[in-house]
């Protein structure tokens, strides 16, 4: 007979009281532990200092110190003050000397701490005010409403004050685990009490019953359950959610507790974890599983792991690079080469999408060779039927994604038509053992090198290309390769010159008509339809870049330039569109030449190559610190990139109100979505001061899909000059923030 549960309202009230009391107890315990830890560290450090001081005193006692004879003060300088020098060491007599005053030294300008940075660093918005800035006593007395307005900009959220507001505490993971475990003990005690009362009633009626096997089994199972840790009751999570609503709903808390307990287990593996391919526990897995971390962590836009510039915008791309193809070698690589097998070379070349024979779109299937036996043909048919339930198009998409240097994640493409039935080369089967690591590596290499088994064997290093070929036939990977639509060469360029002229006119119209609205570039992702008014690139008036997943022949895609000069005039489409030449698109101007960065003919790729000038930081003649150039530069030559934190416009508004009070701001508008803030992180160009007659100018340039700020020379600048550029202040702000205008030299 089950014991009736108390009413739900009483249970929730009971658990709320328990949650509050346990949370307050844990807070006091944490504070006590922190205080005890600080005291223990202080005592330990003080003991170390005492020990070191005692050692030094003993060393000083062993030294033979001779007192220096005191010098008599020179008379005749009555205006000089006398001072007495006393020594703490015994044996040294006091000395009386004349005091000589030093000349006044100019103070170093005030500089707030900042971290050096060589590229933009995207950060998240700060929705909680970390600290209330100190503006001085004068500002505090005169403008008392500033602090209130600042706190209101963060919706009243200040770090450290959330504990005083009931229900607004964000519980840390450690405290959350301890709180749930502590509350779980109360539920265990209640259940034990209920079980004791129910067991007592049952034992009275069953005292004389014999111990049966069934009762023994129940007793053993009860002991096992009691030994294991019981999962907390749902009422506990409901009570915590009602007391701390900002931490989520009860289901979220339950899932959070389950994840934290699994993470605390040292033997538990993380989710979607593949064993180390170099370890003894390597497994034979599919290509997608082997490259899961690669596709997740590697940024295809800047070719880095854990990129800080595109952490939230990972977009796929199926655009095929126009690079040199890897072809199968015509001659065998050795005695164990697969090309020595009868028909293997023709078989691999026919199914290799990178060979010339696959360049034309085949309208009919090849006829099976007469030398091929019926058994071989039936074997191929059986292999195809066995693989019919696999998605051929998806397998190819995941394989071709790695060969694509612009692809971020495996993408889906249309399934290719069924490959022709060809005779499988029958080779004497050799008992070759493949480890899990070798099989996984083969599947990874096969997505890049396809049927070039000689290259795959060289990369594996443990198998011959004949063995690799036999394993590929066994895996039926050769039959999965599409040969028609996916890997066909570029289409005929019929209206190339006409389209290019129309494209250049479009750039000029866009340059003339458009307003100052510049939006951040986001790659479009609609491979099945052309770019129209719903395309995000067209909606934001951006060109489709090489990272977009639209058709390579898209009319909105920027194809690069065909210049053969320095690309520093408006004759260059890239320079006209205020963007740097792309090394993957501009193949004739020299932007794609990477052998020597300083001798490259194209002058419109300095930002992406980091060809900045040597700058010096020194006190400025205008205000505070200034940036000086160490080498002379010519007009319109690139000097440096303005780097800093990449923040949103809303975050810039919140930070700007504090910077205006300090009368020092390093905010620079990048586009309508983001702002570069060099206050906390930046480079030396952040110290360049404002002037209405500057020698530099700033320009926002599109560099490989990213807006970046370049500082260029407005005129010829000599070595040692201080750099100035126009902050574009209004007249009121210029009088407010700019105190001294630099003296302009008459040239």
Curated annotation (Swiss-Prot):
Keyword Repressor carried by entry: yes
Against SMART domains, the record matches this protein to: CXC, SANT, SET
All copies of the CXC domain together span 504-606
Q: Which residues does the annotated region (Disordered) include?
A: 188-231, 378-421
Indicate, by first and last residue, each region the UniProt record lists as having compositional bias (Basic and acidic residues): 194-211, 382-393
Short sequence motif Nuclear localization signal: positions:
491-496
Phenotype for residue 690 to A: Loss of methyltransferase activity
Main enzyme class: transferase
List locations, semicolon-separated.
Nucleus
- GO cellular-component term (any): chromosome, telomeric region
Q: Name one GO biological process term.
A: chromatin remodeling
**What are the protein's UniProt keywords?**
Chromatin regulator, Isopeptide bond, Methyltransferase, Nucleus, Repressor, S-adenosyl-L-methionine, Transcription, Transcription regulation, Transferase, Ubl conjugation
Q: Which reaction does it catalyse?
A: L-lysyl(27)-[histone H3] + 3 S-adenosyl-L-methionine = N(6),N(6),N(6)-trimethyl-L-lysyl(27)-[histone H3] + 3 S-adenosyl-L-homocysteine + 3 H(+)
Coarse class of the primary localization is nucleus
Name one molecular function that GO assigns to this entry.
histone H3K27 methyltransferase activity
> What Gene3D superfamilies does the database record attribute to this sequence?
SET domain
What biological function has been recorded for the protein in this entry?
Answer: Polycomb group (PcG) protein. Catalytic subunit of the PRC2/EED-EZH1 complex, which methylates 'Lys-27' of histone H3, leading to transcriptional repression of the affected target gene. Able to mono-, di- and trimethylate 'Lys-27' of histone H3 to form H3K27me1, H3K27me2 and H3K27me3, respectively. Required for embryonic stem cell derivation and self-renewal, suggesting that it is involved in safeguarding embryonic stem cell identity.
Q: Which family does it belong to?
A: Belongs to the class V-like SAM-binding methyltransferase superfamily. Histone-lysine methyltransferase family. EZ subfamily.
Q: How does it assemble?
A: Component of the PRC2/EED-EZH1 complex, which includes EED, EZH1, SUZ12, RBBP4 and AEBP2. The PRC2/EED-EZH1 is less abundant than the PRC2/EED-EZH2 complex, has weak methyltransferase activity and compacts chromatin in the absence of the methyltransferase cofactor S-adenosyl-L-methionine (SAM). Interacts with EZHIP; the interaction blocks EZH1 methyltransferase activity.
- The molecule here is called Histone-lysine N-methyltransferase EZH1
Recorded source organism is: Homo sapiens
């Amino acid at each position: 007979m089950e014991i009736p549960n108390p009413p739900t309202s009483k249970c929730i009230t009971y658990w709320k009281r328990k949650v509050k009391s346990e949370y307050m107890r844990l807070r006091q315990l944490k504070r006590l532990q922190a205080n005890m830890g600080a005291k223990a560290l202080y005592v330990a450090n003080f003991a170390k200092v005492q020990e070191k001081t005692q050692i030094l005193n003993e060393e000083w006692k062993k030294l033979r110190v001779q007192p220096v004879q005191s010098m008599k003060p020179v008379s005749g300088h009555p205006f000089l003050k006398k001072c007495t020098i006393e020594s703490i060491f015994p044996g040294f007599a006091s000395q009386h000397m004349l005091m000589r005053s030093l000349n006044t030294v100019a103070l170093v300008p005030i500089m707030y701490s900042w971290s050096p940075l060589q590229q933009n660093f995207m950060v998240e918005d700060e929705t909680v005010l970390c600290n209330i800035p100190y503006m001085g006593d004068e500002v505090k007395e005169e403008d008392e409403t500033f602090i209130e307005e600042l706190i209101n900009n963060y919706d009243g959220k200040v770090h450290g004050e959330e504990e005083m507001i009931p229900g607004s505490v964000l519980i840390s993971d450690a405290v959350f685990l301890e709180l749930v475990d502590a509350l779980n003990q109360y539920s265990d005690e209640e259940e034990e009490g209920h079980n004791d009362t129910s067991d007592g009633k049952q034992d009275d009626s069953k005292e004389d019953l014999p111990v049966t096997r069934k009762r023994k089994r129940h007793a053993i199972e009860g002991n096992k359950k009691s030994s294991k840790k019981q999962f907390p009751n749902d009422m506990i999570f409901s009570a915590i959610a009602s007391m701390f609503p900002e931490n989520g709903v009860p289901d979220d808390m339950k899932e959070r507790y389950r994840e934290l307990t699994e993470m605390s287990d040292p033997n538990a593996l993380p989710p979607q974890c593949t064993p180390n391919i170099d370890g003894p526990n390597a497994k034979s897995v599919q290509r997608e599983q082997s490259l899961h971390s690669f596709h997740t962590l590697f940024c295809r836009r800047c070719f880095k792991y854990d990129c800080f510039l595109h952490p939230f915008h990972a977009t796929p791309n199926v655009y095929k690079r126009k690079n040199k193809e890897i072809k199968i070698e015509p001659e065998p690589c050795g005695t164990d080469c697969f090309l020595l097998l009868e028909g293997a070379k023709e078989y691999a070349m026919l199914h290799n999408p990178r060979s010339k024979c696959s360049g034309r779109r085949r309208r009919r299937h090849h006829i099976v060779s007469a030398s091929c036996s019926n058994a071989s043909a039936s074997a191929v048919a059986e292999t195809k039927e066995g693989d019919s339930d696999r998605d051929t198009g998806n397998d190819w998409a995941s394989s071709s994604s790695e060969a694509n240097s612009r692809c971020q994640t495996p993408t889906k493409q249309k399934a290719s038509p069924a490959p022709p039935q060809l005779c499988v080369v029958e080779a004497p089967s050799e008992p070759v053992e493949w480890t899990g690591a070798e099989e996984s590596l083969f599947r990874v290499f096969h997505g890049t090198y396809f049927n070039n088994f000689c290259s795959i064997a060289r990369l594996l290093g443990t198998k011959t290309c004949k063995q690799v070929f036999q394993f590929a036939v066994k895996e039926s990977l050769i039959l999965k390769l599409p040969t028609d639509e996916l890997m066909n060469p570029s289409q005929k360029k019929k209206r190339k010159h006409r389209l290019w002229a129309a494209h250049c006119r479009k750039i000029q119209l866009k340059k003339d008509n458009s307003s100052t609205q510049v939006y951040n570039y986001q790659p479009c992702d609609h491979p099945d339809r052309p770019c129209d008014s719903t395309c995000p690139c067209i909606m934001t008036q951006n060109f489709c870049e090489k990272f977009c997943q639209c058709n390579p022949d898209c009319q909105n895609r920027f194809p690069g330039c065909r210049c053969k000069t320095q690309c520093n005039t408006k004759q260059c489409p890239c320079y006209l569109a205020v963007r740097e030449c792309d090394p993957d698109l501009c193949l004739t101007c020299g932007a794609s030449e990477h052998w020597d960065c300083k001798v490259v003919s194209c002058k419109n790729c300095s930002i992406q190559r980091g060809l900045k000038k040597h700058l010096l930081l020194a006190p400025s003649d205008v205000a505070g610190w200034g940036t000086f150039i160490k080498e002379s530069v010519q007009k319109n030559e690139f000097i440096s990139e303005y780097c800093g934190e990449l923040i949103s416009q809303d975050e810039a508004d919140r930070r700007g109100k504090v910077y205006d009070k300090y009368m020092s701001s390093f905010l620079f508008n990048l586009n309508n979505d983001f702002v570069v803030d060099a206050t906390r992180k930046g480079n030396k160009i952040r110290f360049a001061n404002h002037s209405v007659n500057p020698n530099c100018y700033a320009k926002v340039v599109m560099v490989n899909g990213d807006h970046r700020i370049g500082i260029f020379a407005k005129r010829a600048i000599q070595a040692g000059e201080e750099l100035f550029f126009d902050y574009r202040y209004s007249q009121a702000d210029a009088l407010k923030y700019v105190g001294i205008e630099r003296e302009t030299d008459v040239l």
